[in-house]
């Protein structure tokens, strides 16, 4: 994992704002949180303290919007645990899901020929890849090639196959890439260099590198939700932990990276919160609620 030297009770580390002051003046009306490595603890649960801080923020008049790389269907257990009924940005920004009504409002599909060409080029460069895909729509599932293993596959009713052609039997939202010897950073760089026009690559978590349609990210998805609520970037405080959160944190009025996060994300943050296992989101929300920076 990454730097986890920040522990509960230690002072928060702050870094200079990105050209604009984000002191106690602004009132943040939207709290945007990633799930894995941010709102969720390492055991994929939300702490009572974090639940309490989110309830306080809501009572103060702030909206909470989940912004995650997970497909909407993979978020359902967390919507239940959080009693979450608002709009959620899923699939790295390519899906908007109405949790209250249980409806996928919009989504996109990966360009299959472009994805296949990218994978051929990448395999020629780095050698064998272990692959999985997430199929499109509300009934999304993992289709997983032998050799690929992720702990959260069970949430999307995985179908495992030794035949890579079966990855493409249904429309696909994204491809998950894994290499047995390359680091995540090295695989991400190589995949970006090999990506066909119209595709992009994100490093979404430990051993999670994803091939996605270009033009969508967590910032574009959250901007769409914020507009529907009559809000702008300046109204938003955002929390994340991985490089796929960089667009989100750059867009938001105040950017908070978790202490357990990736160095590239910390470099663009206004503030470093305690780690996800140390109630980092809760600590920041409690502080800004106490000083009146939430409504």
Give residue spans per PLM region.
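Mg2+-dependent phosphoryl-transfer enzymes with acidic/Ser/Thr/Gly-rich catalytic loops
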Residues: 3, 18-30, 46-47, 212, ...
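N-terminal glycine-/serine-/threonine-rich phosphate-binding loop
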Residues: 15-34, 38-64
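Active-site metal-binding loops of divalent metal-dependent hydrolases
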Residues: 35, 93, 240-242
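Residue-level signal for inorganic ion chemistry
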Residues: 37, 57, 68, 92, ...
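Active-site phosphate-binding/coordination module
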Residues: 48-150
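Short active-site oxyanion
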Residues: 61-65, 84-86, 174, 234-236, ...
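Short, structured coil segments at secondary-structure junctions
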Residues: 82-85, 91-92, 100, 194-197, ...
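Conserved acidic, metal-coordinating active-site core of Asp-based
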Residues: 125-239, 243-251, 260
């Amino acid at each position: 994992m990454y730097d986890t030297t920040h522990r509960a009770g230690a002072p928060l580390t702050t870094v200079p704002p990105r050209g604009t002051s984000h002191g106690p003046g602004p009132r943040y009306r939207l709290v945007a949180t990633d799930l894995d490595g941010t709102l969720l603890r390492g055991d994929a649960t939300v702490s009572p303290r974090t639940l309490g801080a989110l309830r306080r923020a809501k009572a103060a008049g702030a909206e909470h919007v989940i912004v995650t790389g997970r497909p909407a269907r993979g978020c359902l257990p967390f919507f239940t645990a959080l009693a979450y009924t608002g709009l959620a940005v899923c699939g790295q920004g390519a899906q908007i899901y109405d949790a209250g009504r249980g409806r996928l409002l919009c989504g996109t599909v990966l360009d299959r020929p472009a994805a296949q060409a990218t994978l051929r080029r990448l395999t020629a460069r780095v050698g064998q890849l272990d692959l999985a895909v997430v199929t499109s729509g509300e009934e999304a599932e993992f289709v997983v090639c032998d050799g690929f293993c992720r702990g959260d596959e069970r949430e999307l009713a995985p179908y495992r196959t030794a035949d890579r052609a079966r990855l493409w039997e249904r429309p696909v939202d994204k491809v998950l890439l894994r290499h047995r010897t390359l680091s995540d950073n090295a695989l991400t760089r190589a995949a970006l260099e090999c990506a066909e026009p119209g595709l992009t690559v994100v490093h979404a978590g430990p051993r999670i590198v994803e091939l996605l349609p270009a033009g969508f990210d967590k910032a574009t998805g959250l901007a769409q939700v914020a507009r529907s609520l009559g809000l702008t970037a300046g109204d938003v405080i955002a929390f994340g932990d991985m490089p796929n959160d960089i667009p989100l944190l750059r867009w938001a009025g105040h950017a908070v990276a978790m202490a357990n996060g990736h160095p590239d994300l910390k470099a663009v943050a206004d503030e470093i919160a305690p780690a996800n296992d140390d109630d980092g989101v809760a600590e920041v929300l409690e502080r800004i609620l106490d000083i009146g920076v939430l409504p």
